[in-house]
Amino acid sequence: MAEFQGYLELDRSWQHDLLYPLIFREYIYTFVHDHGLNRNRSNLLENVGYDNKSSLLIVKRLISRMYQQNHLIISANDSNQNPVFGYNKNFYSQMISEGFAVVVEIPFSLRLVSSLKGTEVVKYYNLQSIHSTFPFFEDKFPHLNYVSDVLIPYPIHLEILVQTLRYWVKDVSSLHLLRLFLHEYYSWNRFLIPNKSISIFSKSNLRFFLFLYNSHVCEYESILLFLRNQSSHLRLTSSGGFFERIYFYGKIKHPVEEVFADDFPTSLWFFQDLVIHYVRYQGKSILASKDMPLLMNKWKYYLVHLWQCHFYVWSQAGSIYINQLSKHAFGFLGYLSSMRINLSVVRSQMLENSFLMDNAMKKIDTLIPISPLIGSLAKMKFCNVVGQPLSKSTWADLSDFDIIDRFARICRNLFHYYSGSSKKKSLYRVKYILRLSCVKTLARKHKSTVRTFLKRLGSELLDEFFTEEEEVLSLIFPRTYSTLRRLYKGRIWYLDIFCINDLVNHE
């Protein structure tokens, strides 16, 4: 953050002129490029092509065209290929939007740092990941009785997103540019289709739309916490995880009133009070309570009226269901979590009398939803809808090494993400699909059959599918196969997973 502040020399006047660095400062686009590379490396995802945007020639040409005001006026009837630019119009729109997101984020980030008042901010790679949510479930939810899945609705009009920023952005031209981005190259229908509402996070303009989404949701969560404070007479403390869009800034403790005064960069948040727990990641939140459903109903209608009356977002109370935690499994972050009761009999003896006691222990069980996962693989053309492997025809032009590396990386990432599941047998079906899909892709490239190809090269060709967890545990326990097998079947939560995998995100 000091680097941003040193380069840009931010002060309060930037609130009135946000377009200046976007048009006159070339290193803004370097920040965008570096952020994209770091995000791809840290999250073990494939590179999405940020190297193609780092060309100084392209950036200079883009900025020189922006000096001419008429080139920023783009009609919806124009062709996607701009003959003046020489590149696809959406390519330049994406570059400008990501640079715009960097410029607008900086005042929020500086405000967050100043709000910590001397508290040391630890770098993101030393902090918790989204896997830390599940130990929170395991610790708190066995003592709760009711749970509710809440899908946060999107605004039905683009102007609502712009109005959220108007409270602090005084630069009218920046708001007009924001409207241009929203109407130009983004399909608003995605906001209206529930099962695609989170798909914006995996698109090419991730930083830009994640910024808009966080500004909208955190505004609603601030009001939600105000209502929560009014319902409690105790001054409780709450711990929150602060993100820079994807990464944690730190896990700090503050009074609730102070935390949510500067809560803009929050992407993952959880708070607790005497009777209710709240967890959110991106567009889905979980409400859980120990008491009777009356309290849950109260909070449900709070949410609905808040969305409808304050944010002009249509929602119905009937779409939010309250379920018993002991009888209902809820999906969150790609896992299917449910309550499991372990029964045991304890023999106790007191003086000359002995008796048996039945002991029931509640435990949160995290499972892998195999059907949605196979559906995601089918959508990516690795298999059909019933799980039969297919060749990946779009990768057939790559080298053998690149084909194997891509398939193996996807397999390792899935095993890495689902390491916290108590039952990993279903993952071996996914491994089988990816391995056979890889072989079929290689056989298609070499114009051969699968059997002939394997007979010629041998099974050692697919050693890359040996998962990371298996490698690590085999090094620690090289001679005790039973111990290795027991540990690998256990739950392992990692601290280096900063965003949900596209194949895992079934929402």
UniProtKB/Swiss-Prot annotation:
Signal peptide: none annotated. Keywords: Chloroplast, mRNA processing, Plastid, RNA-binding, tRNA processing. It is found in: Plastid, Chloroplast. It comes from the Eukaryota. GO terms for molecular function: RNA binding. One of its GO terms (cellular component) is chloroplast. GO terms for biological process: mRNA processing; RNA splicing; tRNA processing. InterPro entries: Domain_X, Maturase_MatK, Maturase_MatK_N. Belongs to the intron maturase 2 family. MatK subfamily. Usually encoded in the trnK tRNA gene intron. Probably assists in splicing its own and other chloroplast group II introns. This is Maturase K. It comes from Humulus lupulus (European hop).
